[in-house]
Amino acid sequence: MQEIEIFCDGSSLGNPGPGGYAAILRYKDKEKTISGGEEFTTNNRMELRALNEALKILKRPCRITLYSDSQYVCQAINVWLVNWQKKNFSKVKNVDLWKEFLKVSKGHLIMAVWIKGHNGHAENERCDSLAKLEAQKRTKTIT
């Protein structure tokens, strides 16, 4: 099983508001960066969108170490998700994205590692900048 690192971040201006996401996928010395966004969203949705879009790129089951500054995403993957499924996602926010995560993560072994945001972690800083740029692209200017 290939070992992959994924770094991801999400941003929302206004929360909710225009949002962006970015992820870096790394396998050995190869790297791929993705980014995108939505017109009206939250930072948690963008964090999760970054991860889901990154997972869609992988063509075979992998052992993944996910690095995120989102306690929400890390705790959900490492702790909460099992119980959420047992309770049929009752009272869980962003159910659509969590159900998508379950589909796109199938076959992968994922360990989520929380990293402190805005603390000089190079890949997190890159993702943060890209996510903010994507969010800014989606702000409507009033004329």
UniProtKB/Swiss-Prot annotation:
GO molecular function terms noted in the UniProt entry: magnesium ion binding; nucleic acid binding; RNA-DNA hybrid ribonuclease activity
Swiss-Prot/TrEMBL cofactor(s): Mg(2+)
Gene Ontology cellular component list: cytoplasm
Domain RNase H type-1: 1-136
Domain of life per record: Bacteria
Subunit structure: Monomer.
Cofactor mode of binding and number, as noted: Binds 1 Mg(2+) ion per subunit. May bind a second metal ion at a regulatory site, or after substrate binding.
Binding site for Mg(2+) 2: D9, D128
Keyword terms, alphabetized: Cytoplasm, Endonuclease, Hydrolase, Magnesium, Metal-binding, Nuclease
Single GO BP term: DNA replication, removal of RNA primer
E.C. number: 3.1.26.4
Organism: Helicobacter pylori (strain HPAG1)
Protein name (Swiss-Prot/TrEMBL): Ribonuclease H
Reaction catalyzed: Endonucleolytic cleavage to 5'-phosphomonoester
Cysteine-cysteine disulfides: none
Residues reported to bind Mg(2+) 1: D9, E47, D69
UniProt family annotation: Belongs to the RNase H family.
Function: Endonuclease that specifically degrades the RNA of RNA-DNA hybrids.
Compartment(s): Cytoplasm
